[in-house]
Amino acid sequence: MSSGALFPSLVPGSRGSSSKYLVEFRAGKMSLKGSTVTPDKRKGLVYIQQTDDSLIHFCWKDRTSGSVEDDLIIFPDDCEFKRVSQCTTGRVYVLKFKAGSKRLFFWMQEPKTDKDEEYCRKLNEYLNNPPMPGALGGSGSGSHELSALGGEGGLQSLLGNMSHNQLMQLIGPTGLGGLGGLGALTGPGLASLLGSGGPTTSSSSSSSRSQSAAVTPSSTTSSTRTTSAPVAPAAAPATTPSPAVSSNDGASEATSPTQPIQLSDLQNILATMNVPATGEGGQQVDLASVLTPEIMAPILANAEVQERLTPYLPSGESLPQTADEIQNTLTSPQFQQALGMFSAALASGQLGPLMSQFGLPADAVDAANKGDIEAFAKAMQSTSSQKERESSEKKEEEEDMSLD
C-alpha cells in the first residue's frame, strides 16, 4: 500500500513528479523482530522525491523489479535518518519517527563508504527543509498551481475535495498552531493564501490574516513534537451538530455536519490556535504502541469486524478488499504514520472545534478539547454501544410487528 498525495490537483497537468530525485543511494531494507534487525538481501534504492504538489516523499524501491514498496509523505520535523552506532558489523541506518515508536531500518549497498555521511546529511536536509517549488530549476509548476488557488473560490474548491481524515492530516502532522503541515504542502504560499483568501473588505478576514501571520512554524513545531503523543485517523459517526469556532468578533456560527467545511472556518481555527505544551487533562497515549498487531489480531479475527472494516480499505486492481488486506493495512508504515499524526493532533487539545463540526457527541468534543485521548475513546465507544442498542431494539420491534 503506497501513500498518495494528500490533495487532488486543481490545475490540469500539474500533477506528477519531478524528473530527478533530490537524493538517492543504494540501500536494502531490514526487518525488525524483537531487538534484532535482519537484512533483506534484495537490491534496493532509497530516494527522496518532491512531487509537483510540493510534497516530500521518502521512498524505497526494489532495483530488480522496479517496484516501489515504501512511499511515505514526510513533513518537516517528522523524522530523522541516522546511522545506528550500535551496529559495528555493517552500515545500518534507521529512519526514526519523532512521534511514536515507528522505525524503518536500511543497510547501505553503495560500494564505497566515503559518501555515506553526505547521503545522510542531504536526506535529512531535504526532509526537514523542503525546497521551494521551482527552486531546483523546474518549470515552476508549483508556483503556477499556487496562483491558480488564489482567492476564496480556489481554496474553497480545494477544501470541498477533502475528506475529514485528509483535513485532520493537513492540520495534525507538525503541530496545529505552527502551520508546518500547511507550509510543507505548497511552501509558504498556501499558508499565506489561507490567511488572505477572503475578501479584502472583510474586517474578520483582515483580523484572521494578522493572527495567522503571527503564528510561525518555528515558534511551535519543536515543542509540539516533543510533548505530544501520536494517534490514528478515525472516521467517527456523526450525531448532533455543535457550534463552530467563534469568529474574531466573539460571535458564534452554527455549522451543520452535513455542510462542507468552509474556508472561513479553517481560517479561524488556524488563526486562533496556540498549541499548549500538553493537553489539559488525561494521560497521554501513544496509539501506535497500543494498536499493535498482537493486540489487534484477535479483534480482526472476528468476521463481523472484518465485514465492517473491509469497505474502508483502499480500492484498486492490485489492492483486493479482503480480510488479509486489513491486516496488511494496519501493519503498514503509512497507517502507523497516520496513527502518529492523529495522536499528536488529538493530544494537543486543539481538535475540539473540528470534532464539533464533524457532529461528534459532546463528551467526545470535550475530551478532544482537553487532549484526553482515553476519554475520547470511551466517549466514542459509548456512542457506538448506544447506537447498537437502539438498532437492536428497533430490529426487535420490527420483528414483533411482523408477528402481529
UniProtKB/Swiss-Prot annotation:
The question of whether Cytoplasm is a record keyword is answered with yes
What does the record give as the function of this protein? Component of the 26S proteasome, a multiprotein complex involved in the ATP-dependent degradation of ubiquitinated proteins. This complex plays a key role in the maintenance of protein homeostasis by removing misfolded or damaged proteins, which could impair cellular functions, and by removing proteins whose functions are no longer required. Therefore, the proteasome participates in numerous cellular processes, including cell cycle progression, apoptosis, or DNA damage repair. Within the complex, functions as a proteasomal ubiquitin receptor.
Sequence similarity: Belongs to the ADRM1 family.
Name the Gene Ontology molecular function terms of this record: endopeptidase activator activity; proteasome binding
Q: Which first-to-last residue range defines the signal peptide?
A: none
The protein in question is named: Proteasomal ubiquitin receptor ADRM1-A
Its quaternary structure?
A: Component of the 19S proteasome regulatory particle complex. The 26S proteasome consists of a 20S core particle (CP) and two 19S regulatory subunits (RP).
**A cellular-component GO term for this protein:** proteasome regulatory particle, lid subcomplex
Q: Where in the cell is it found?
A: Cytoplasm; Nucleus
Q: Where is the Pru domain?
A: 17-130
Polar residues: which segments have biased composition?
248-258
Where composition is biased (Basic and acidic residues), the residues are 386-395
| Annotated PROSITE patterns | DEUBAD, PRU
